[in-house]
Amino acid sequence: MNTSLENLTHKMQRAALGKIVDVALSHAEHDREKTMCQLVDVAKQFYGSGFSDETYENAKKVLTDPDSKWTKLINCVLDQTNPHVARTTALNLGYEAFFRGTKMIRENRVKYQCNIPWLILFDPTSACNMHSVGCWAGEYGNKNNLSFEDMDKIVTQGKELGVYLYMLTGGEPLVRKKDVLKLAEKHNDVEFAIYTNSTLIDEPFCEEVQRLGNIAFMLSIEGTPETNDARRGEGHYAAVMHAMDLLKKYGILFGTSICYTRQNIDAVTNDEFMRFLCEKGAHFGFYFHYMPVGNEAAPELMPTPEQRKYMIDRIRYLRSSACDIPFYPMDFQNDGEFVGGCIAGGRNYFHINSAGDAEPCVFIHYSNANIHDQSILEILHSPLFMAYHNGQPFNKNHLRPCPMLENPELLEKMVHETGAHSTDLQSPESVEHLCEKCKAYAADWQPTADEIWSHHKVRESRYENYKDWKPSQPLD
């Protein structure tokens, strides 16, 4: 009875929100200020005390200021996005993932006493049509694939726990584009985001993505044609440009996925490049610190401490109101303060590779569990995942969040204690070999990281997913 009532309430809430979004989008053409106020009011109605009253009022103030960077950014996205895509994203990402999913996840973390993620990343295939320098995935070949049934199992079981955001990587996920579209159509209440090299995005595919409305893209790009093609191969930059033009034409949401290395940091962060991305239609992006994963990795590509400090300062500037570029960058390694440190091991996300192995992180190729013979919940209770759950945060300085890159002794200890095995599909790498490559880097980075953190005002989170975390005062 309770389940039936919950399902009815869910359907009614989604339908009601859908009507509100329709009205807001209809106003967007001629009254953006009214649209912004409506969206904040809707957020307050659904999220309530998840944010303070001051936060909601400040949001209204900023979003109704025509000169605000955030107003300009949202206007760019609204102008560019197909209405059906915008509506579906608002419902799937805004309502299902952020509102309803978050509530379910927090309840299930208490119920099951383990990490429950906010998103799941999985690889439909190990196949890739490129061979980027320093990329482990390009070495895997095409021998492993998750079946449609495997992917359906991941999403179905994830939804039962409250997970409504799924990211796909590989390999190249669009090698399996037919199954990806089939999956998105079956699970039309979740949001899918695909990391892609762009080469397989074509017009017929974009037509289907627009029809479905629940797929976004992160396109791999690394600066100029020269810096990009030097690592990713001749002709790749042109393929990305073509894909951007198609996605913009069809009003499909897309951003960028950028791996920054010792060799390309200026090329992927300078004003000219950022403005160019906006002109092409990308207004958000993920930056990833190069990781020396795999026996064939190139540790010399890891940034210097000075370069990493520059990235911290640069990304924060690009996000600030002092910068007029309508682009929102996120840095997977340097934004730990906003997510409480390491998010892997299911704390906020985990990864399933194309052989079905469940890994704590896309960069941590060790596991005790496989989706072929275990459920998502069993995976989250597996020894290595529970070691993450019991050990997070791995460092109180969230500029040193990772148990591999900045605290390599911790990953080595967890792998040994849990008996996790290497999941590298081509050339299994011992945890000693991996962590040895990180020790000098960790030692070099620590003084700079600690100096930055010592002058940083740490804000207490209203909610934190650590094993024994409790707020210093009751939440509203």
Sequence positions of predicted segments:
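Short cysteine clusters
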Residues: 128, 132-135, 342, 356, ...
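Flexible mid-to-C-terminal extensions adjoining Fe-S/redox cofactors in radical SAM and related proteins
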Residues: 4-12, 16, 20-23, 27, ...
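Conserved alpha-helical substructure of the radical SAM core
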Residues: 36-204, 476
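Short, charged low-complexity linear segments at domain edges
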Residues: 96-117, 329-332, 336, 370-387
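Secreted/processed peptides and extracellular or luminal domains of membrane proteins
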Residues: 134, 138-141, 348, 367, ...
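Radical SAM/AdoMet-radical enzyme domain recognition
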Residues: 148-168, 174-289
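Short loop/turn microsegments at loop-to-beta-strand junctions
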Residues: 120, 346-348
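Radical SAM enzyme [4Fe-4S]-AdoMet core and its adjacent flexible, acidic
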Residues: 1-57, 61, 229-345, 353-355, ...
